[in-house]
């Protein structure tokens, strides 16, 4: 979070357990940006990243190894618990429907994010394993790590900048493989005039003209400090559980006094 994470490469996962992923958190919500904005979404946040962006507001250094079967079992309960914890029945529209092959998919989008999800070599096997579990699948990647993403998965490439002393210097261009495969690009935008995040880079405009694919933008949130609830949790707990990482770590109180830089966020938005 805020550039304090450990930086790792694909070698970190070279001895990964078979048919398993290193998972930080899992939660159900509405997708707020990109090609599936407004759609119900099951988020799986994978652990570790090859970058350390100073504005990043998510934790992804801690995690648990989970088998593909364990991930989908937890996904099922996460989706159902979203409504059950509100004292409501799970709506029929999202539940799997019976068909000739058994049960169909959940009517929601699987969003795999991080960290940098493409660091984990087992991810492609999981996406193929779970192809019929969700109506749509999306990966969000910074574009600097190569993997062959299956065609049934929407690849959202969200490029980030190199930094020096916590200040953005220039965009890191996605690899040729990822840029060719990407279904869309997504950029975080800042109102700071001298920041690279103030504009969509020229190469992205050229990519859009050549491919006809979409570019999405979203505002950068600027914080004055770490969220208090997260600081307390990490200070008091010897080890953070999946449930804790999937709730407190993922739900930041925007009403916490002094947390957000309101002036900068107003101009960014």
Where does each model-flagged region fall?
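Conserved AdoMet/S-adenosylmethionine-binding subsite of the radical SAM
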Residues: 106-108, 118-269
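Conserved Radical SAM active-site core
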Residues: 2-28, 40-41, 50-153
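Short, solvent-exposed loop/turn elements at beta->coil junctions and helix N-caps
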Residues: 29-33
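A short catalytic or substrate-binding loop motif that flags glycine-/basic-rich loops and adjacent residues
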Residues: 35-37
């Amino acid at each position: 979070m805020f550039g304090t994470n450990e930086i790792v490469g694909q070698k970190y996962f070279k001895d990964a357990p078979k048919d398993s992923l290193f998972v930080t958190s899992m939660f159900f919500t509405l997708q707020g940006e990109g090609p599936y904005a407004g759609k119900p979404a099951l988020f799986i946040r994978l652990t570790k990243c090859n970058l350390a962006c100073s504005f990043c507001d998510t934790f992804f250094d801690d995690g648990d190894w989970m088998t593909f079967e364990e991930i989908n079992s937890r996904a099922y309960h996460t989706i159902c618990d979203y409504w059950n914890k509100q004292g409501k029945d799970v709506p029929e529209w999202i539940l799997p429907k019976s068909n000739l092959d058994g049960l169909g998919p959940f009517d929601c989008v699987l969003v795999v994010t991080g960290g940098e999800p493409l660091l984990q070599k087992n991810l492609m096997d999981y996406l193929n394993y779970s192809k019929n579990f969700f109506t749509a699948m999306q990966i969000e990647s910074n574009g600097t790590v190569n993997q062959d993403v299956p065609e049934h998965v929407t690849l959202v490439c969200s490029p980030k900048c190199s930094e020096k002393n916590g200040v953005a210097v220039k965009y890191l261009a996605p690899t040729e493989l990822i840029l060719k495969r990407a279904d869309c690009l997504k950029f975080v935008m800042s109102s700071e005039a001298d920041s690279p995040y103030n504009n969509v880079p020229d190469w992205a405009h050229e990519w859009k003209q050549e491919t006809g694919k979409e570019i999405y933008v979203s505002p950068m949130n600027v914080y004055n400090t770490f969220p208090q609830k997260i600081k307390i949790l990490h200070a008091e707990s010897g080890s953070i559980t999946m449930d804790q990482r999937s709730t407190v770590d993922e739900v930041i109180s925007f009403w916490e006094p002094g947390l957000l830089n309101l002036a900068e966020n107003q101009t960014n938005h």
